[in-house]
A protein has these predicted regions:
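Extended, charge-rich alpha-helical scaffold/interaction domains
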Residues: 1-812
């Protein structure tokens, strides 16, 4: 979110009129022709930059101003601040400047980089960037002096091939590959020359080049890498660093099958095996084609970086650099091994040693992800056991570093990228869903899109029900993780720090450390499925965590649960068998009244339950008979109306829709009668008219659904018709009572009366009523009997109209 002042500035920039913009551009044009650059010039350019950047579409600027900005952009003598602003303005403005800027490219490194950024931003196809590409390649071929464009060529080239990978020809790919090898492997071993003060009476003098050192201060004895430390660096050392930064992208683009280089694709299998043996010998690497030689040198470079990462860094920044280099090196080695399996046997000793060194250090948790990726891709080739790696990854990382947002994102991306392989080959992937969901519980707002995509891969038949409970308990997990984090920070003896967290949090912290509640928290924080009870004492846990229900983290987590539930049910209904369907229905009934009490959370979850209750029963109508006892217990309790009316209404509706011998031959008259009697008792209880009665706290929709369901059941056991008709006849008195008239609108009361009257008339013709209200097992098209949750179908209204017009012919 922007601050109010910033929002105001952006709004002004978006709403500026065209005439005002043209006048402002004319003023800037005059300022740019002044000999000296004033503060007013810079301020005006900054404002113009805001104007052209604040809208999604490109703003059209006067052509003379655009040309002047291009001149500033190309001029190496202009202050860099003006070049930066000019580049940004031209990049966002109209008309495009691609062709005019490409016609005369500068050899000055700073100017060239700003011009290139505009060309890459405005290019519409590879032809637009072709002049820039040729200029770059020409600069790479020639040996330019220090300070010219070679230092900036590789970042620009990397961006270019990302957007237009097909732009380079085979010869150009080979040219760049050869240059990358030289920069990667043969950078100088001395520090760059630096100027030092010569004292008061003498001028500055050049310090003699000193040797480079490792991160631990030892003089470097091997070739230069990004982990070599110096006060200053030479041009080729900078190129070495740039090369390493882009080598992964280069290998992914031009070191795979089917790329522009056909030399390696055309070799026979014998030739390929020979080349692999040659590549295994570093001394023979010059015999290799450019791509294979680059692969070899990149592999050696990564091995050296992994060796260097074992050194104890003197500076914290170097420690962070070591971590980043490990991640990048293992990823590059993974790519190389994927292209040439002969490297797998050379890489695994190094990777295994690296894992052995890092797996116990949480500071290197992010480095475990590329290591796990390497094992996933190549452990079968090398016949190496990878169980320990994935056990570590799915158990320790989420449990102990759930609060690391970058690790959380990369972890979920790893799971998404490899979901199908993890399901098939990693036994504890699906078992670890309680741990995997900890990242979501802590970082819910930032990871919801990723988990929507990931969740289906976590659903397995043996853990599906537990996963559903875990999703419903996700806000409890967020609260428990919060308490775990606070408990680790504040010692039990430090009561002042506890009290600073607030009385509510302090009470929850106290409960978190109580031995009597330890089992509850151990369950909710469990690392894998199948450990502990599911919901035996869940209500107690909700009471303990009641004071955390307003925590922003818990509230945000609760908001993602309905989204995940939709994904879960949409996935599970495609693969669930009859047993699973029955279990799901029981969970819906049980958990509808066993949810963490967060504002709107219960209501939103029950809405999801209502939707998918109908879907489950439609897919498998015998569920109503299978779980008749539990459904009857639920429907017989008026208390469920007041706490979960929407879900209760849907339960009543599915009873009327699917409790029929048409769907299940086990549906006996006795079963129908028991349901009818229970629902009749509920309807009677909630519609009793007393003078002192308070207005009803339920909707008219519930009344109409109950009445319709009773009528449906009566048509399936005609002995029930008299008592149902009697019950329906009392609805007019209820609807016209004072408390109801005060609560419901005239339209609502008329709907209740009309519905009751139509049903009574319909039940006077049992055979017709059965046609209108009885379900039809077959047919997906329009059905006369089909009821919605709030109104009767057209067929019923038609029959009722006939009964009104011919009332003299009705049987008495």
């Amino acid at each position: 979110m922007y601050a109010a002042a910033t929002e105001s500035l952006i709004k002004q920039a978006r709403e500026i009129k065209e005439e005002e913009l043209q006048r402002f551009c004319g003023r800037i044009f005059k300022l740019l022709h002044a000999k000296d650059v004033s503060g007013d010039t810079v301020d005006s350019l900054q404002r113009l930059n805001l104007i052209v950047s604040a809208t999604k579409y490109a703003r059209e600027l006067p052509s003379d101003l655009v040309m002047k900005l291009q001149m500033v952009l190309r001029s190496s003598s202009c202050p860099e601040q003006l070049q930066v602003l000019s580049s940004s303005i031209v990049r966002e403005s109209f008309p495009p400047s691609v062709h005019s800027l490409s016609s005369d490219l500068s050899h000055d490194s700073r100017t060239f980089s700003y011009v290139a950024s505009v060309i890459l931003a405005q290019a519409g196809n590879k032809e637009d960037v072709m002049p820039l590409c040729h200029h770059l390649l020409k600069s790479l071929e020639s040996r330019l002096s220090d300070g010219e464009i070679s230092k900036h060529a590789l970042p620009i080239l990397s961006k270019m091939i990302t957007v237009y990978p097909e732009m380079l020809t085979d010869d150009q790919v080979n040219l760049v590959s050869r240059k990358l090898v030289d920069w990667l492997r043969y950078a100088s071993m001395q520090q760059g020359a630096s100027m030092t003060s010569g004292g008061f009476f003498s001028g500055p003098r050049t310090r003699q080049p000193a040797p480079l050192t490792e991160v631990d201060g030892v003089v470097t004895g091997d070739f230069f890498t990004v982990l070599c430390v110096g006060q200053s660096y030479t041009e080729d050392q900078w190129m070495n660093m740039y090369t390493f930064s882009m080598i992964k992208n280069w290998l992914l683009t031009y070191d795979t099958d089917g790329t522009t280089n056909t030399e390696s694709d055309d070799r026979s299998e014998v030739d390929s095996s020979v080349m692999s043996m040659v590549s295994a010998t570093s001394s023979s690497s010059r015999l290799l084609p450019p791509k294979e030689r680059l692969r070899e040198k990149a592999f050696e470079y990564c091995q050296r970086l992994i060796e260097q990462s074992d050194r104890k860094a003197l500076k914290k920044t170097d420690t962070e650099l070591q971590k980043a280099c490990i991640v990048e090196s293992v990823s590059i080695m993974d790519i190389i091994c994927g292209e040439d399996p002969s490297y797998v046997y050379r890489a695994f000793p190094c990777i295994k040693a690296l894992y052995g060194r890092l797996h116990g250090d949480l500071a290197y948790a992010r480095a475990l992800l590329p290591i796990a990726q390497f094992y996933l891709n190549h452990s079968e080739t090398a016949a190496v056991d990878s169980d320990a790696v994935f056990c570590q990854l799915f158990s320790q990382c989420p449990a102990e570093q759930f609060n690391e947002p970058m690790l959380a994102f990369e972890f979920v991306q790893f799971c998404l990228l490899n979901a199908s392989v993890l399901q098939d080959r990693v036994a504890n992937y699906r078992q670890s869903f309680p741990n995997i969901l900890k990242f979501l519980a802590w970082n819910s707002s930032g990871l919801i899109a990723e988990y929507v995509e990931l969740l289906p891969s976590l659903i397995a038949p043996d853990t599906a029900i537990e996963l559903l409970h875990t999703i419903l308990d996700l806000p409890c997990l967020a609260a428990a993780l919060d308490l775990q984090q606070r408990s680790a920070c504040y010692q039990a003896s430090d009561r002042t720090m506890w009290d600073q967290q607030g009385a509510k949090v302090a009470a929850c912290l106290e409960a978190f450390r109580q031995p009597s509640y330890r089992g509850l928290f151990l369950y909710i924080l469990r690392p894998e499925a199948g450990t502990g009870d599911t919901i035996d004492r869940l209500k107690m846990l909700h009471e303990i965590l009641a004071d955390m229900a307003e925590s922003p983290r818990v509230v945000r987590c609760a908001q993602v649960v309905p989204v995940l539930l939709h994904v879960y049910f949409n996935t599970i209904t495609q693969k669930a068998d009859e047993k699973m369907m029955n279990q799901l229905l029981l969970v819906l009934l049980e958990r509808s009244s066993l949810l963490y009490n967060i504002k709107t959370f219960n209501f939103e979850v029950q809405k999801v339950f209502s939707t998918h209750l109908q879907a489950l029963c439609k897919l498998h109508p015998p569920l109503i008979v299978d779980q008749s006892r539990e459904i009857l217990d639920f429907a017989s309790s008026p208390a469920n109306i007041y706490s979960k009316e929407d879900f209760y209404t849907h339960v009543v509706w599915v009873i009327g829709e699917y409790l029929s011998v048409s769907y299940d031959p086990r549906c006996t008259v006795e079963l129908i009668t028991s349901f009818c009697e229970s629902l009749e008792a509920v309807l009677f209880e909630i519609t009793q008219v007393r003078q002192s009665a308070s207005p009803p706290s339920f909707s008219p929709r519930l009344i109409t659904v109950l009445m319709t369901t009773l009528a449906k059941l009566a048509t399936r056991s005609q002995d029930l018709i008299p008592r149902v008709s009697l019950c329906l006849s009392k609805m007019r008195t209820f609807a016209r009572s004072g408390p109801v008239m005060a609560c419901y609108s005239e339209e609502d009361t008329e709907e209740i009366i009309t519905r009751a009257h139509e049903l009574i008339n319909l039940l006077k013709l049992p055979n017709v009523a059965q046609f209108v209200l009885a379900p039809s097992v077959g047919g997906d098209g329009p059905r006369w009997h089909r009821d919605t949750n709030a109104s009767l179908p057209q067929g019923m209204r038609a029959v009722s109209g006939l009964l009104h017009r011919h009332s003299s012919f009705l049987p008495t």
